[in-house]
From Swiss-Prot:
It comes from Xenopus tropicalis. Its main location: cytoplasm. This is Baculoviral IAP repeat-containing protein 5.2. The modification Phosphothreonine is found at residue 46. The keyword Iron-sulfur does not apply. Belongs to the IAP family. The BIR2 domain is required for vascular development. It holds the Pfam family BIR. It comes from the Eukaryota.
Length: 156
C-alpha cells in the first residue's frame, strides 16, 4: 500500500479517527503538550524542537521540564537552554526507532506504520511488565519480612 496512513484515513472533524496513542505520531499533537514549557526563545530546546525529537511535555510540581518520548518512553529532565533535543534523545536512548526514522510519520505507508507501532507497543508492554514485576518484588519483600519476623518470634 503506497498511501500514507494518515492521509488514507477518512477525516472526522479536524483529525482522522485514530487511537489517542497514534495521534502522538503527529508533530502538532506532541507540540500541543508544550503549552507551559519553560524554554521558548533564544535556546536550543524550544517546544518545536522538543516535539520534533518525539517528546511530549509531562511536567510535575517538582519537575516542570520533564519530557517523555512517546515512542521509547524515555523520560528526561534537567534541561538547559543549550541542550539539543535530538542529540539528548539519541544520547539517552540510541535504539529509539522513532528518532531513526528517515521520513516523517505522515509519509509512512500503512505497513511501515503498523510495523513501527508494533515495536512501540512492545516497548510499552515491556515497561508495564517491568513495573508489575517491581511492584510484586516489593510486596514479596514485605511479606518475607513479616514471615521472618513471625519465625523469629516463634523460635524465641
Amino acid at each position: 500500500m503506497s498511501a500514507s496512513l494518515i492521509s488514507a484515513l477518512p477525516p472526522c472533524g479536524n483529525e482522522p479517527p485514530m487511537p489517542d496513542e497514534w495521534r502522538l505520531y503527529r508533530l502538532a499533537t506532541r507540540l500541543s503538550t508544550f503549552a507551559n514549557w519553560p524554554f521558548t526563545e533564544d535556546c536550543a530546546c524550544t517546544p518545536e524542537r522538543m516535539a520534533e525529537a518525539g517528546f511530549v511535555h509531562c511536567p510535575s510540581d517538582n519537575s516542570p521540564d520533564v519530557v517523555k518520548c512517546f515512542f521509547c518512553l524515555k523520560e528526561l529532565e534537567g534541561w538547559q537552554p543549550e541542550d539539543d533535543p535530538m542529540d539528548e534523545h539519541k544520547k539517552h536512548s540510541p535504539s529509539c526507532l522513532f528518532i531513526a526514522l528517515k521520513k516523517k510519520a505522515e509519509e509512512l505507508t500503512l505497513s511501515e506504520f503498523l510495523k513501527l507501532d508494533l515495536e512501540r507497543t512492545k516497548i510499552k508492554m515491556q515497561k508495564q511488565m517491568n513495573q508489575h514485576i517491581e511492584n510484586f518484588q516489593a510486596k514479596a519483600n514485605v511479606v518475607r519480612g513479616h514471615l521472618e519476623k513471625l519465625d523469629a518470634d516463634e523460635t524465641q
